[in-house]
Amino acid sequence: VVRAFLLCALAADHLVLRMHRDIRAHSAAVLARYIVFSKAQLQAPREDWQVAACWGADAACALQELFGAIPSTQYGACRGQGFCIVQLDREGCQFECYLEQTSAAALAPRLAQLIQPGAEHQWQALQIASGIARIEAGTSDQFVPQMLNYDVTGHISFNKGCYTGQEVVARLHYKGTPKRRLYLAGIARADITGQPQ
């Protein structure tokens, strides 16, 4: 896996790739090689949209009240003027909200009334607990999709697409068994000191 991203359609002719900041430049260079064969344009990262995570049992109701509509399926999206909401889980408890800066400023007071603020590390912990592995510069090109459980979580399609290493990935999927996979583990003790190795 060289890079992993979420593709979001902010408009019919405006697609955005959400990925870790430290792989943006390399991803743009790789995509630039292929975009010449299409009628699309690759633009530099834009800072006029913000991403907010929203999670919890009441997240769907709060977003419904705020935006009027929400997606109802995993990786489904609902968009409107200045916003796009993507549902990340099957249960409808994890969402990413893409907000144009003007929309974000206008919605901030109402959002603060409906949703309790959380920290980024809480969202990251939830993503880990959900089995979602993100690719950063240090982990790029270190794993095949099966090692990150992308075949189990629906992050890779075996029916369509063309990507680097497709033959190896498909062979492992149809004829082999991965030697390594991600597993979730936890430690009940809170008094452990030191840095992870």
Feature names for model-found ranges:
Residues 1-197:
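Basic, glycine/lysine-rich polyanion-binding surfaces/domains
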